[in-house]
């Protein structure tokens, strides 16, 4: 016995072990009225040829119909301008060194402030602007008083601070 799934229902056909696919197609034609030339039988993911034989007991065969036509073949597009290259950021060797400063004595000091938020954790440095420190990860901003910052650090302001 073989199960045959057609477009709208399932058929149960008695098939001998050595029977070929062509005779199964003729049985389907008698039961459903689908011409055997238009039938495409699929078993285990591959299409069966008319000369194939030796299907397993209680195998499920799917019936598909041959379709006419298809989509029109299209021309390959020809572009007039070349493709724009993506911008690759330059790799800076030892980029971590901009976060630390080493004295003559070998003492290491941090140049940037670490973010205090628990979501960031240790090792996340804040960006240093003229009047604030900004964390790019959690978007936390610490505003620095410009009068006290210039007096303590000895730094001048950004571009706007120059005269």
From Swiss-Prot:
It comes from the Eukaryota. There is a cross-link at residue 70 (Glycyl lysine isopeptide (Gly-Lys) (interchain with K-? in acceptor proteins)). The keyword Magnesium does not apply. The gene is ubl-1. Residues 1-70 form the Ubiquitin-like domain. In the N-terminal section; belongs to the ubiquitin family. This is Ubiquitin-like protein 1-ribosomal protein eS31 fusion protein. It comes from Caenorhabditis briggsae. One of its GO terms (molecular function) is zinc ion binding.
